[in-house]
Amino acid sequence: MKSGRVQACIDYIRFNHEAEGYEFSEEEEQSARSILEEESTADELIQRYIEEHGLAMQYTKTSDELSVYPDTSTLVNFFSIKERSKLRKVEASLANLRTAEMLTESVDNTYDFEYLKTIHGRMFSDVYPSAGQIRTTVAAKRTVFCHPTFIESAAEDIFSRLRKEHYLKGLDREIFINDLAFFMGEIEALHPFRDGNGRAARLFFYQLSVHAGFDIDWSMVDPDRLLEADISAIDGDYQLLIDVLEEVVL
């Protein structure tokens, strides 16, 4: 991977990490960079992280992998961590490494719902047995997302339209940005997973943008502004998201 592309990927991973509320340390940057430059593998660095942080696989299979531990809001996880703040830090760190791994790969997949589920499944596979699974509970966070009963049918409508739009290839920049904002808003409203929706969707649309002949300068994206734009898009107002993308789509 060329040095300019490596830095673009680092900027993307840093954005995700900081959007989760964490500082992207020099050590974390070096770990991601070593994967992008193919000096280390994600498997090696994840195993090292697990050992250095004294984590142990203590998972006992449950009937509902999408459930939370009793009297907590913490998802069932391979390390049986029940303290949500601790789990979120582990999740963010390991997801960064899997994201770096996926960014080194060429995407031969169709940009469909199965691929979005694959991204989520790989990104969080080291933490959650439920990675890649569609949520079965109602979700709300400043707005109400798609009811779980309708996720599959709504996804079929969204991705069918994306397919008919040729995955946004061959468009001029203005039309591309408008269409990208629309589909980003639709997936945000779909919110198909119990957790990790934003990171999975961002990687999906980042790769789709590159595939369509564009790029995104993540170093210029303000996480709070993007969040507000995403919420507006869920409600059918795409202008804030279009304004954000106008500044960062290359």
Regions found by a protein language model. Give the residues of each.
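FIC/Doc superfamily catalytic core
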Residues: M1-L250
